[in-house]
Structure formats: structure tokens, C-alpha cells
């Protein structure tokens, strides 16, 4: 697992070369945002220890398998609070919350989130931002300390910055897993309006001063 210090408050953890999770530094340790694919639990725990802290909570941008893949194993090892977007948590609980077929991978989870996230909620230093489209309940997280935006899969940055509603030939082909492409574009525009200082995403490297790159991505996605 590759470890990249993006800001003093955020460490990007990359598994298999293209799937990211994030350690967000707080006074009591780390918030882990997303868990990558299955089999990563020990590596994620080790990365937090190597960075000088422990994982105190797990917050998820959405419920797809490449973001919740190691959730059950981590919860079993750590017993920490798990926070998942409201609609995606309801989907994982077996509720029918949409009227058409879901896209992306929705693995069966044993973990029941203790908190269902909605726009405006806080997770330590992170503000929850509604960003539906890639999944029905997808959220992003904005760090109030330095305006780092954890955009989940609303954008990808492998090769270049793209909105996930727009088909782009580079793996992981996020458009194929995007539930509502029009809504995803609206969310991408809303995230751009936040004027983040740094953009980090579920797939691809961090982008500093990302405004121009986000603008180009939105223009291509329209």
C-alpha cells in the first residue's frame, strides 16, 4: 500500500495502484475515510500506526465495494464508530430507496453503521457535503482547516481530472458505476463552487489548486 502525505492533516493510502483511502488527522488520532477493497484492513491499521496514531472512526463517501471492501474486517479488529451516507446505508440495510437498478458493486456487509450521514453533519474537522449521483447517497468531505476536499468518486484524477458521469477510457471506468449521470454533474459543479485548495479522490492522485482542472472536467462532462 502506497502512502502519500498530501497535507499535514491528510495522508492518502493507495491500494492496487488506483484505489484510495485517507487518514485525516484529528486530536484523538485519525478518521479513516473509505476502506478500499477487501483484504486491506491490516495495511490500513499499520499505516495509521506508522503515521503516529490510531484509527478512531471510519467515514465513508459511499457504499460501493471498492470503498467498503475492508469495512467488516476493520470494524471487527477495531470496534470503532462507522459513519455512512444515509441513503447508501439504507441500501445496504436492504431498503428499496431507488426505483431502478443500482450501478456499481454493493457487497453484503455485516457492519451496521452507527451514524447515517447527511449534508451539514460534522465528522471531526470534516464537513459532510451532499454529492449524490455516483451513488444515490454519495457524499464528499471538506476539511475546514485547509479546504482539502475529499470528493470520493464524483471526480477521478487518473490521467487527468474527470467528472465520473463522463466516460473516460482509463480504469476504473467510473462512469459505468455512476447511478445518475445528470445528478453527478450537478454534484461536481457544487463541489467546484466550494473552491477547494486541494482535491483528493477515490481513484487518482491529489490535485493542488484544482479549480482549473475541475472547470475543464465539468466542461467535458456537460
Predicted feature residues:
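Conserved beta-strand hairpin/beta-sheet module of binuclear metal-dependent hydrolase folds
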Residues: 1-50, 141-153, 157
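Short, flexible loop segments at the rims of nucleotide/cofactor-binding pockets, characterized by
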Residues: 8-13, 35-37, 58-61, 126-129, ...
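Divalent metal-coordination and catalytic microenvironments
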Residues: 9, 24, 34, 44, ...
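Metallo-beta-lactamase
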Residues: 38, 127-130, 136-212
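Binuclear metal-ion centers of metallo-dependent hydrolases, dominated by the metallo-beta-lactamase
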Residues: 208-222
Amino acid at each position: 500500500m502506497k502512502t502519500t502525505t498530501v497535507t499535514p492533516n491528510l495522508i492518502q493510502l493507495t491500494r492496487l495502484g488506483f484505489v484510495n483511502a485517507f487518514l485525516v488527522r484529528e486530536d484523538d488520532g485519525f478518521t479513516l475515510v473509505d476502506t478500499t477493497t477487501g483484504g486491506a484492513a491490516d495495511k490500513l491499521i499499520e499505516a495509521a500506526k506508522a503515521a503516529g496514531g490510531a484509527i478512531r472512526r471510519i467515514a465513508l463517501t459511499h457504499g460501493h465495494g471498492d470503498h467498503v471492501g475492508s469495512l467488516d474486517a476493520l470494524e471487527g479488529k477495531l470496534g470503532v464508530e462507522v459513519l455512512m451516507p444515509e441513503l447508501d446505508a439504507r441500501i445496504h440495510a436492504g431498503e428499496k430507496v431507488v426505483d431502478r437498478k443500482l450501478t456499481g458493486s454493493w457487497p453484503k456487509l455485516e457492519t451496521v453503521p452507527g451514524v447515517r450521514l447527511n449534508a451539514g453533519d460534522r465528522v471531526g474537522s470534516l464537513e459532510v457535503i451532499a454529492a449524490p449521483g455516483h451513488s444515490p447517497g454519495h457524499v464528499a468531505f471538506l476539511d475546514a482547516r485547509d479546504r482539502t476536499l475529499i470528493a470520493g468518486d464524483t471526480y477521478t484524477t487518473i490521467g487527468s481530472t474527470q467528472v465520473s458521469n463522463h466516460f473516460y477510457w482509463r480504469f476504473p471506468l467510473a462512469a459505468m458505476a455512476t447511478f445518475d449521470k445528470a445528478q453527478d454533474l450537478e454534484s461536481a459543479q457544487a463541489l467546484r463552487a466550494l473552491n477547494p485548495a486541494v482535491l483528493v479522490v477515490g481513484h487518482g492522485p491529489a490535485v493542488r489548486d484544482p479549480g482549473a482542472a475541475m472547470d475543464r472536467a465539468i466542461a467535458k462532462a456537460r
